């Protein structure tokens, strides 16, 4: 949900850093926040990190969002340099420039090796639920559920609050029916990075103030200035999902026992241990969180490969 907060942007930053290292290949970025601005912002990020050809899929469902920070993607996408040229070039000018997320999912998944794709969902669940319900098309004779079963290795989701069964977490609350559908029907293993994990592992403001002397302009820092007007400590919610998807636990996380996570009609998430369950969630203790934050600080402040 690019634009509702800046941890989405840092999560994409981390994916590009992993791609720089050859540890990940980014097939596409799917938006589940409406509007052309978020699509433009994702494309300008991909371009800034040296991968302008990464496909961007537009949202297929309007989420139920209330409140939130200013929509910084639109502002950053419109920024100009001293000569009046786009500060962060991008080619998207209208929503129709982007395929819808389900069509893009089906096109890309059909071309991948079986059980080779990891999907990292750090926003709402509308695209994933719609993918499950999609039918055979020109890209694949398989239904959406069959296509996911064949091509997807696993799903990592930033959603919910495991330690507080009464908490209504934003990503869940913004599209409860779709989130219920994903947790009840998704055919692969799901690993959840819950709200409390990122809330208790915060990227320090000092990182933003002190670690980016290598660049005059940075699209994520500019987004933060628009969204907050200042640098401050901030939770690493979405970033934890990307880190786990690429590195696994790696000393930063502990994986729960298998179980089943259900989403209530009110938007709460409940976990029940079950040896046959396909859901797990991430935890971290004090020492793990310290290492986690140090690692993320090094990653996000590192100069991208194409800027060296």
Residue ranges: model-predicted function:
Residues 2-308:
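N-terminal acidic, glycine/proline-rich low-complexity segments
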């Amino acid at each position: 949900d690019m634009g509702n907060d800046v941890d989405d942007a840092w999560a994409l930053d981390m994916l590009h850093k992993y791609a720089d290292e050859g540890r990940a290949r980014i097939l596409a970025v799917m938006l589940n926040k409406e509007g052309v601005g978020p699509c433009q912002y994702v494309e300008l990020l991909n371009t800034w990190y040296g991968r302008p050809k990464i496909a961007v899929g537009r949202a297929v469902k309007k989420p139920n969002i209330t409140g939130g920070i200013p929509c910084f993607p639109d502002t950053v996408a419109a920024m100009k340099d001293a000569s009046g040229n786009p500060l962060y070039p991008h080619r998207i000018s209208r929503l129709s420039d982007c395929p819808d997320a389900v069509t893009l999912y089906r096109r890309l998944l059909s071309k991948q090796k079986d059980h080779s794709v990891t999907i990292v969902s750090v926003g709402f669940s509308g695209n994933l639920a719609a993918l499950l319900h999609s039918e055979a098309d020109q890209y694949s004779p398989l239904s959406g559920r069959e296509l996911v079963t064949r091509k997807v290795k696993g799903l990592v989701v930033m959603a919910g609050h495991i330690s507080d069964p009464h908490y209504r977490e934003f990503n869940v609350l913004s599209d409860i029916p779709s989130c219920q559908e994903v947790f009840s029907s998704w055919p692969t293993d799901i690993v959840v990075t819950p709200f409390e994990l990122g809330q208790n592992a915060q990227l320090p403001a000092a990182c933003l103030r002190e670690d980016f002397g290598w660049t005059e302009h940075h699209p994520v820092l500019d987004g933060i200035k628009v969204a907050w007007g200042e640098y401050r400590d901030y939770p690493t919610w979405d970033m934890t999902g990307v880190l786990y998807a690429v590195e696994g636990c790696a000393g930063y996380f502990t994986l729960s026992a298998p179980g089943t996570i259900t989403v209530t009609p009110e938007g709460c998430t409940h976990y029940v241990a079950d040896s046959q369950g396909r859901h797990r969630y991430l935890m971290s203790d004090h020492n793990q969180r310290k290492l986690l934050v140090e690692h993320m600080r090094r990653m996000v402040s590192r100069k991208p490969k194409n800027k060296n």
